[in-house]
Structures are given as C-alpha cells and as structure tokens.
Amino acid sequence: MAPFASLASGILLLLSLIASSKACSCAPTHPQTAFCNSDLVIRAKFMGSPEIIETTLYQRYEIKMTKMLKGFDAVGNATGFRFAYTPAMESLCGYVHKSQNRSEEFLIAGRLRNGNLHITACSFLVPWHNLSPAQQKAFVKTYSAGCGVCTVFPCSAIPCKLESDSHCLWTDQILMGSEKGYQSDHFACLPRNPDLCTWQYLGVSMTRSLPLAKAEA
C-alpha cells in the first residue's frame, strides 16, 4: 500500500500547487433546490476530526445520523451512514467542518456515490437549529412536493425572465442582498395546478402565496 500512499500524496501536493490560487466558488441555492437536487438529506452529528484516505483525494468525517429526510429508495436496506466523504483540499471544494460541538445536529444534503455519502463546500449543510421553523417543516415534508415539478428560478439582476409557468422567481438576492431572505426562509415553490407553480407560504397558522411574477415578453 505504501506506493499508492506515496502516489496519492504526490498528487495531492501537485494539485495543491496548481489550484492554490483558485478558490472554490458556489452559487447561491434555495433550500428547496438543495433538497430536490440531492440524493440524500439527513440530520446528523459530526463525531470528530476528518480522516485522510491516503489512496484517494478524499477525506471522511465520522457522523452519527439521527434522521433520514430523503433517500430511502436510494439506500435500500442501509440503516444509516457512518461517514461523510469530501475532497481533501479546499481548492477542490472540500468541506471543512469547524464546529467542535459533537452534540450539535446538522442538516446535510449530499450525493450518493458507491453507497457513500459525499459532500462538498457547496453542499447545503447547516446547523439544524439555524433553519427557520418553516424550513425545518419543509425539509421534513413539504419541499418534496415540488421536486421534479417546480423550479426555483434565481433572479440575480433586473430584469428577470421566467421561462416557464412551472418556475418561481427567487428574488431574495435582489431585494434582500442575500440568498437568506424571506423566500428562502418562509416559502416553497409548489404546484398550484398541473401547469402552474407558485410560491406558497410555509407558516403553521396560515397559508398564502406571493404574487405571481410575470415573465417578460
């Protein structure tokens, strides 16, 4: 195994030199988009520091899954995941877990590869308690209703154009200056009828929709 370890170390060093000036860039993502585009969505706790896998360009974090929110069909009879895999270097969008609190629970939206959970710096991965009550509710049972049917369409500059009635115009970046705005925190893009999707409020005590955004001619 030593030759493979030496080769992997050499490759890591070479890539770090090549990519040292390149930072990982991630596009803003609405939580619903993160849910729908992920193979797996779980709640889990990180149990320690990452372990470098010498024969690959990856490292892995030991995790303790507390609840699976998406991915039941994909994992089959698997009862959980012990590790989350990520690129070993930040320049390759490797995820770096900074919290030292092993009792803190995180929402992890990742990909399934060869039966393993994979995450990157661009993955939707946040402390569960940092999510709004509406987001927590949506990750458990609401976002799934829009997957494959509706699309959150980012608006990063005015004017914005909708390409389909199944799109919901996401304007948080324009109106709030951040992707963590009102639509992200409190709304989901859901079907109103077979040919139309609209923003729908995720509050517990009331249900209302944002005004429909009209596409430019």
Curated annotation (Swiss-Prot):
Which SMART domains does the UniProt record give?
Answer: NTR (SM00206)
Q: What does this protein do?
A: Metalloproteinase inhibitor that functions by forming one to one complexes with target metalloproteinases, such as collagenases, and irreversibly inactivates them by binding to their catalytic zinc cofactor. Acts on MMP1, MMP2, MMP3, MMP7, MMP8, MMP9, MMP10, MMP11, MMP12, MMP13 and MMP16. Does not act on MMP14. Also functions as a growth factor that regulates cell differentiation, migration and cell death and activates cellular signaling cascades via CD63 and ITGB1. Plays a role in integrin signaling.
Q: Positions modified as Phosphoserine?
A: S178
PROSITE patterns reported for this sequence:
NTR (PS50189), TIMP (PS00288)
Which lineage ranks, top first, belong to the organism behind this chain? Eukaryota, Metazoa, Chordata, Craniata, Vertebrata
What is this protein called in UniProt?
Answer: Metalloproteinase inhibitor 1
Q: Which residues does the UniProt site feature Involved in metalloproteinase-binding point to?
A: N37
InterPro entries (UniProt xref) = Netrin_domain, TIMP, TIMP-like_OB-fold, TIMP_C, TIMP_CS
Posttranslational modification = The activity of TIMP1 is dependent on the presence of disulfide bonds. N-glycosylated.
Disulfide pairs?
A: C24-C93, C26-C122, C36-C147, C150-C197, C155-C160, C168-C189
Its assembly, as annotated, is: Interacts with MMP1, MMP3, MMP10 and MMP13, but has only very low affinity for MMP14. Interacts with CD63; identified in a complex with CD63 and ITGB1.
MF terms in GO: cytokine activity; growth factor activity; metalloendopeptidase inhibitor activity; peptidase inhibitor activity; protease binding; zinc ion binding
Q: Where is the NTR domain?
A: 24-147
Family matches, as PANTHER family: METALLOPROTEASE INHIBITOR, METALLOPROTEINASE INHIBITOR 1
Q: Provide the alphabetized UniProt keywords.
A: Disulfide bond, Glycoprotein, Growth factor, Metal-binding, Metalloenzyme inhibitor, Metalloprotease inhibitor, Phosphoprotein, Protease inhibitor, Secreted, Signal, Steroidogenesis, Zinc
Signal peptide range: 1-23
What protein family is recorded? Answer: Belongs to the protease inhibitor I35 (TIMP) family.
- Expression triggers: By follicle-stimulating hormone (FSH).
Positions with a binding annotation for Zn(2+): C24
Cite a single GO BP annotation: cellular response to peptide
- Residues modified by carbohydrate are N77, N101
One Gene Ontology cellular component: basement membrane
Region Involved in metalloproteinase-binding: what ranges?
24-27, 90-91
* Stored Pfam families: TIMP
